[in-house]
Amino acid sequence: MFAPLLKKLFGSKNEREVKRMLKTVQIVNAFEEQMVALSDDQLRAKTAEFKARIAKGETLDKLLPEAFAVAREAGKRIMGMRHFDVQLIGGMTLHEGKIAEMRTGEGKTLVATLGVYLNALSGKGVHVVTVNDYLARRDANWMRPLYEFLGLSVGVVTPFQPPEEKRAAYAADITYGTNNEFGFDYLRDNMAFSMEDKFQRELNFAVIDEVDSILIDEARTPLIISGQAEDSSRLYTEINKLIPRLEQHIEEVEGQVTKAGHFTVDEKTRQVELNEAGHQFIEEMLTQVGLLAEGESLYSAHNLGLLTHVYAGLRAHKLFNRNVEYIVQDGQVVLVDEHTGRTMPGRRLSEGLHQAIEAKENLNIQAESQTLASTTFQNYFRLYTKLSGMTGTADTEAFEFHQIYGLQVMVIPPNKPLARKDYNDLVFLTADEKYAAIINDIKECMTQGRPVLVGTATIETSEHMSNLLNKEGIEHKVLNAKFHEKEAEIIAQAGRPGALTIATNMAGRGTDILLGGNWEVEVASLENPTPEQIAQIKADWQKRHQQVLESGGLQVIASERHESRRIDNQLRGRAGRQGDAGSSRFYLSLEDSLMRIFASDRVKNFMKALGMQSGEAIEHRMVTNAIEKAQRKVEGRNFDIRKQLLEFDDVNNEQRKVIYHMRNTLLAADNIGETIADFRQDVLNATVSAHIPPQSLPEQWDVAGLEEAIQSGFGVSLPIQQWLDEDDHLYEETLREKLLNELIAAYNEKEDQAGAEALRTFEKQIVLRVLDDLWKDHLSTMDHLRHGIHLRGYAQKNPKQEYKRESFTLFSELLDSIKRDSIRVLSHVQVRREDPAEEEARLRQEAEALAQRMQFEHAEAPGLDQPEALEEGVEVDVALATAPVRNEQKLGRNELCYCGSGKKYKHCHGQIN
């Protein structure tokens, strides 16, 4: 009730933050005259001065005004660009670990230099994260002269980069790269066999460009490094032949069956489900082709893998469409990012789905993969000490940024007011009518000399639009995932008078459409241009620029609404940059995916009530509101999926941190003899306790079993029964002590034979191998657990709590297995006197061979589809997402452990740590 009044009196929180920062802007401006008076050498020397002051204890916050003034002056001298006051506010926002929302054309790349320069002074490294390799290289090369003038080094990490180059890039003060590459390098580092093979330093400060795309859109899909498993290509081929014989079961809204079939498709949750008739039919067909034994069920324990293949085939045929979710390029299935429209070469779907699509397209089927390491962007980016980001559209997702990452969104005021006109949506009954109206709009704009950008949601739609325009004889350029190599060239000239560009969602994120075209690109295309040529190109551009402004600026036409309002706003934002004229219009039909699945009934009834005829369109705020409501519904569902992924991965993440900490400790240690001694004692205690129950009588002891277990686990044959017969005073504790001494003596004898140095090297290698193999198997087990855990909802159990409980049990077993298997291998194996350097070189060769076989998957989120049990109202504990790692508190020894076991920390993971 009083909120509007208080806001009017005191302003919004965002306005108050801007006012606070404006005071610092004034201090920065006060330094400007002093900086202008400095020579280049004196200005450059400021960096060394700042580093010295930091070494003496001065904070970055205190340095900020002077450092920003230095960066601004360097920008003027090197780039010919002076930071506006609002850009200084953007730089402060980044330094404070917040998200800066800035409109298109407001100079986000230049803003980043302020926060990056200041934080690079600490010497701990700064990562600048972009959405693709092109932008990483472009921004690094663009800003490199500025940073190098200021005495800072710049590196770029790219896929397939030689290790030496990549290591040098990470050692630089400022490192550019994509979110995928940073994430995969983190996983690779935790698979390395020596500290020298690692790339990344401690994760200090990251600036994420297009932060909404990376932290929101891509958060649903985990990063997975996998290796090849057994070949099942024949199985995929056979099942692919059977799938077309299955028919879809279709029901009307009232529940009346119009087509009885074998399976149902839910487009909202992107799931397929076999019904009873489908199960029976597929079992009969599998029996006929010899894949299922006579009388056996698909649900038998040993046939569950076959059932997974059937569902993968169904999904490949019914949910994945060529030129929408993927394209076929050079005999490979290449995935298309649904949010950006870009192809993702090298990325593969998990759970056999990629192989099923290859079978569907009659391509060579590549071997299935097994997970070697995985993480999510949510948990990776929360490892940074400080995280910040920039985008043109973050405010709609401010709640999620705060809930998941603890990041506040600051809306930075524009340098010039927005002059773009956003028209109401036009809704048609059919897609053909919609496309006809779009072409009429295009023709009208072209007669006025206006440039037009037509945005589409899929490659298929962009190609359909292109075909329609070709029939009309209208010249145009197409920008989609098939031709993204030409992206910069096409976008650069998309603002010329009368230019027509068809683009998917990838359209120039990070590349501005300049009205009149981009004169710098024209100059760059010339070999050794003369000053006269450059002057002429600038003059020609000025005329074209004025012509486009007078005609109304860039017209953005959208052929459909995306699931996310954010992506619609990004498309609109292509027009009206830096106060330029421009306009936008969305053309929709009831046949569009979003309308058909989420919003069609209400709008269709409204259109019927108006008595609309073929070819007519409706333009009404009520329709726009209905569509936005549908989008909010989809956004809410996607948020729930991302949140559920995080809640499950938080459990995995705690385990991942323990294993990676253990691994890094092993790698860094020169001598792990104490660790081996601890392992030996723990394994011996567990072995003795299994055969001699605590506080039991000697008659209850399984001495023969203990002798056998000692022989099996430690490679030593000990006459335990004889000891007991000969010594009446040998009870449980003294027996443990005697056994331990005998085992230590046997191991010392092995050390004398092999040599201490050789054995120390061998110990580290064995424990690393055992840890990696068991961790890989553990990840697979956790995947299977996650896939089936939602079924616990039917038993009125909380799936998330059940997952926590069972995963803790599995993890405890994993830690015991690491100790047990390491000791068993070390006890049985014969160690040769080998040159440790040769052994390490051999190990590195094996690691490199493994790396060549690795696949990098940005897979669909496993096991996170909304299960029926949850949708039907079974209560699920949806706790608020945890705070970022950088804010976590250290647990006291007597506090409850974070893993959910119910034990005190000192008796649980505190022991491990």
Swiss-Prot record:
Q: What is this protein called?
A: Protein translocase subunit SecA
Q: How is the cofactor bound?
A: May bind 1 zinc ion per subunit.
Q: Coding gene?
A: secA
Q: How does it assemble?
A: Monomer and homodimer. Part of the essential Sec protein translocation apparatus which comprises SecA, SecYEG and auxiliary proteins SecDF-YajC and YidC.
Per the record, membrane topology reads:
Peripheral membrane protein
Matching entries from SMART domains are given as:
SecA_DEAD, SecA_PP_bind
Primary localization: membrane
Q: What does this protein do?
A: Part of the Sec protein translocase complex. Interacts with the SecYEG preprotein conducting channel. Has a central role in coupling the hydrolysis of ATP to the transfer of proteins into and across the cell membrane, serving both as a receptor for the preprotein-SecB complex and as an ATP-driven molecular motor driving the stepwise translocation of polypeptide chains across the membrane.
Which principal EC class is assigned to this enzyme?
A: translocase
Binding annotation for Zn(2+): C897, C899, C908, H909
| Lineage of the species this protein comes from | Bacteria, Pseudomonadati, Pseudomonadota, Gammaproteobacteria, Pseudomonadales
